[in-house]
Amino acid sequence: MDITIIIPMKDTEDQIMKCLDSIKINTLSRDRYEVIIIDDASKQPSEFLSEKYDIHYFYSKKSLGAGGARNLGIRMARGKYICFIDSDDWISYDYLEKGLTYMEQCASEIGMFTLKREYDDIKDIIYKCKYNTLLQLGPEESIKVMAKEYNFDVNIVPSTTNKIYLRQFLIDNNIFFPENRKFEDLLFSIKTMLVASKLICIPDATYFHYRRKGSIVQSFEHKNSEDMLFILKEIKVYLENNNYFEIYKKSFYLFCEHFMNLIIRQINEFCSDENIKKAEMTFIVKNLLQQINLDEYLASISAEKLRMHIQPYIIDTNIL
């Protein structure tokens, strides 16, 4: 078995068939991949999917979260490589074959695909990352590009769904997802990138990510703040425990900036009560300050970045 595709689902029966149809028409021979659906305590089981699509379907009565569902899939997988796909997303027809070909050709532990985002109410084509040629990167370049510390005219996103992993590489390094936490992809991506010997950008094969209303970044609840802070703390502890923090200090602070801005945007956009807004933003700032060394952070940023923190809405800085 070459590839195991792991798909967590939760009350997405109406969307998952588009996902499974895109897998079904892939050019890779059907006997070379398996599909495992981990149903994360949906209100109604979807057992008919097993027969209709010739896949493995596992229903969990206990909610595992996306991370826990993927962990179960990793342990069940028989493929040499693993892909994660969200149940409301889909892939291009050559995704599996190109992924397998380039991973074998380059002897890489991680492969990354073009990620195109689709929205409910936006018709423009939006690429979060796009790869037209084969690129090979080491761990340091990959993480610093992902953090936008380095600019190589290429983007790397922390999502795990537009990637393919060597399964034994995950097992040997005991890398699994944090369970029942949002933003789990960032911690998983950093851990895998740090210990990989080679990462590749796979050209001309696309993962289509559907951004629906009500998704993690299109809504807000207090758990978003708690989970973001938990993930950032875990990243810092992991970097420090493995003597990586000095190398990736600036990247860590850039991740903190990015995810704090994301949460603040969610609070501002989706909380209507001004008192709740203030309480949530105060919670974020106070707790994030416990994760950072202010002197280190100030040393890592430019004067212009500092000005933007102090005067975010002022573009014209002329006195007169």
List PLM regions with ranges.
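Short aromatic/hydrophobic "clamp" motif used to bind/position activated sugar donors
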Residues: 82
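Cell-envelope/extracellular polymer assembly enzymes that use nucleotide-activated donors
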Residues: 2-4, 22, 34, 187
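Donor-binding/catalytic cores of nucleotide-activated saccharide
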Residues: 67, 87-200, 209-223
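Membrane-interface aromatic/basic loop that binds lipid-linked glycans or pyrophosphate carriers
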Residues: 268-320
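Acidic donor-binding segment of Leloir-type glycosyltransferases
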Residues: 20-59
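A conserved hydrophobic helix/loop-capping motif in glycosyltransferases and polysaccharide synthases
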Residues: 3-15, 19, 26, 38
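Glycine-rich, basic loop-to-helix element that forms the pyrophosphate-binding segment
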Residues: 46, 60-77
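Conserved short acidic donor-positioning loop in nucleotide-sugar-dependent glycosyltransferases
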Residues: 11, 23, 39-42, 64, ...
